[in-house]
Amino acid sequence: MSSGCLLLLLGLLTLWAELTPISGLGGPKYCHLPADPGPCSNYRPAYYYNPASRKCEEFMYGGCKGNKNNFKTRHECHRVCVR
């Protein structure tokens, strides 16, 4: 391979690396909201995406209001927020 081809390949790889989202950063903006149990007290386990750990984690949801970073299963949280 000529040096020109190698430079082109290196440039394309660099561009690809810059444009490829880091896992978890490609999801909806609400995936970066904090866990919000809401004002009610009908507590049940739920899952939210934690951008600091880049994982879906369990929290206790009160059953009403809160925000959209709230999923019934870890699988659903992962499907929506981890990319």
From Swiss-Prot:
GO molecular function: serine-type endopeptidase inhibitor activity; toxin activity
Segments forming domain BPTI/Kunitz inhibitor: 31-81
SS bond list: C31-C81, C40-C64, C56-C77
Signal peptide boundaries: 1-24
Localization (cell): Secreted
Major localization listed first in the record, in broad terms: secreted
Tree of life domain: Eukaryota
SUPFAM superfamilies with a match to the protein in the record: BPTI-like (SSF57362)
Expression sites (tissue/organ): Expressed by the venom gland.
Gene Ontology cellular-component terms listed: extracellular space
UniProt keyword annotations, A-Z: Disulfide bond, Protease inhibitor, Secreted, Serine protease inhibitor, Signal, Toxin
Function, as annotated: Snake venom serine protease inhibitor.
Protein family according to the UniProt entry: Belongs to the venom Kunitz-type family.
Name of protein: Protease inhibitor 4
Organism annotation: Walterinnesia aegyptia (Desert black snake)
